[in-house]
Amino acid sequence: MHLSQIVLYLSLLIALGPVVLSDQEAHQQPSVSTPVDTDQCATCEVRQQIKTMRLNAIKSQILSKLRMKEAPNISREIVKQLLPKAPPLQQLLDQYDVLGDDNREEVLEDDDEHATTETIVMVATEPDPAVQVDGQPKCCFFSITQKFQASRVVRAQLWVHLRPSEEVTTVFLQISRLIPVTDGNRHIRSRSLKIDVNPGPASWQSIDVKQVLTVWLRQPETNWGIEINAFDSRGNDLAVTSAEPGEEGLQPFMEVKISEGPRRARRDSGLDCDENSPESRCCRYPLTVDFEDFGWDWIIAPKRYKANYCSGECEYMHLQKYPHTHLVNKANPRGTAGPCCTPTKMSPINMLYFNRKEQIIYGKIPSMVVDRCGCS
């Protein structure tokens, strides 16, 4: 190659070099804003993943806290058949209507793993044939679960629905404990209540059966059930003891109030955000759990509640529980994986539900609502 050609080649290389580099930079320039959009999309995806994980965790937690391996197979139609049309149950349902998502206390139980039961409603079933004569009586047996054994019974009320009376009359509501038939005897008279009834619509009446329940708890083998009668002055039995046509949901039931020990309170603080918040730090976000979406018709109330979830970044200095933690992490940054955004305060929810024995339970399930989030 001649010297003149070499000089020309070098001159072109020097002249065109910057132009090529400028073209590359021009092509790369629009991609500068891409990481920002990618970060925003990534944040949305992370939150969505956290919400999905939280919902799945809530399903597992509820079953675990209620000591269930799987959800009871109770459909909406069965719920309508089993749900008593009774005053105390309606009061519990009205409580949810009035209180909504605020029907929980700012406390946590000592047992944070399992549900603390407050009220159990047991619908009467047919007693064992050993205490029946010619298929009678058809009522009433109450299955006493182990839940009672570890609890303190505060109150036990038997609710009986009385058919309407055409005249003013005195009704004697009688409760008799059933025993296996021997020598024609199958009863042990337990309680009797005198009731003055006015003519008019049907009514619910209650009678204290704590003493009867106490006997069953101490001697489970004596629980064969009870017979209920409510005779008026003419000898008519006004008590509804079985679900005859037109009397569905009016069968007797027992309402038991129990207590399971003290509770303890906890306090904390944190940040609250919504889904449109630009906050990148650890924050509490809203999340509504809908049991109907789960297909869980066995939960009577609430049908939905606000569970919330935690999401965000945690710097060593941000919302740490102890001030010295930041100094330790700064001195040894490789000695820890760093704080995570997690719930620092949780509270229970009240729930009315059917268990596997088709008993209606009103209880408090601990640690189901995220009240505060923090880095720990």
Curated annotation (Swiss-Prot):
It comes from the Eukaryota. Disulfide bonds join 273-283, 282-341, 310-373, 314-375. This is Growth/differentiation factor 8. It comes from Oreochromis mossambicus (Mozambique tilapia). Keywords: Cleavage on pair of basic residues, Cytokine, Disulfide bond, Growth factor, Secreted, Signal. Highly expressed in muscle. Also expressed in other tissues such as eye, gill, ovary, gut and brain. Very low level detected in testis. Not expressed in liver, kidney, stomach or heart. Pfam families: TGF_beta (PF00019), TGFb_propeptide (PF00688). Its main location: secreted.
